[in-house]
Amino acid sequence: ATGVDARWYDRIMADFEPGTELFDHNYRPGMQPAPWGWSAASAALLRQQGVPQEALPTAEALDRIRLLSHRRTAATVQGLVAAQLPFPIADAAVECTAVDAIPLLLKAGRQFIAKLPWSSSGRGLLDSRKCSPEHFIRQAEGMIHSQGSFMLETAYERVADFAMLFDCEASGSCRFAGYSLFDTTPSGQYTSNLLLPDSEIESRLAQYVPCEQLHAIQQALATALAKVCREVYSGPAGVDMLIADTPRGFLVDATVEINFRMTMGRVAHTLAERYVMPGAEARFKVVSGSASDATPVVDARRLSGGSLLLNPPSPHFNFVIQIG
């Protein structure tokens, strides 16, 4: 490969022995393309790199994945999950094609978050707690003009942001793959991941919600995802959730967002599992600007202190694990 910082690469290979070779991005026969997520744009980029059309999804398959990625899928799955549970979870988001009822709801003191139907990772959000009613309505109308509708959901006081990770098959199966625990802004914009084993994440969530409820939600989600992915999508899925502090007690919003693609949570889960020393308090984040001062402390092929640069050094932004 060209253009890779040799000093960074040699240190990664020496410290961690990741068991993989660095290779260029040119297609070789027999390779199975696996982009971060499937879209018309990612398929076109792969085609430009020499990947033959027969190795790529058809245009019809890409259209089905795009429809699956609409936020109304999360609302549908929330309803399917709620129907399987003997305890309450947060209400599903509502798709709105007009703003007629919004002024009365805001006047009554309700607080909402409006979301663009095709958006993710905390982008495309409008929080009524952070703007005037007039601004909220005007921006919501802009969402309708841009994407035909918006999703409206209650704005909660969140005490925990986490995700359940799944592997889905278009044949109609879905397997739980682990947890992700992350930090967000009050409106839900992603900032960083904690790198912890699943058992520790579940223990932290159990401060608010019994493990039995988490397991029931996990099973209900697997059933619901298997249903909506059948004959449409095979690959990783990350279901973002939150635990809200409400007058009714702590409440799980089980489908804040569903990402039918690779996610930062899946990356964090893999990093925690393979490269972080058990018991270390590690965090995975994207750092703007240079991170040339990253200095790792490595024991037995595991990061035990300091910070580790996960990509060749860049002056623009860097993926970093920090401990402490």
Indicate residue ranges for each PLM-predicted region.
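ATP-grasp fold ATP-binding core
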Residues: 92, 105-127, 145-158, 239, ...
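ATP-dependent carboxylate/phosphate-activation module, predominantly the ATP-grasp catalytic core
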Residues: 166-223, 232, 259-285
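Peripheral (often C-terminal) accessory segments that flank ATP-dependent C-N-forming ligase machineries
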Residues: 276-324
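Phosphate-binding site of ATP-dependent enzymes
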Residues: 109, 133-191, 242-255
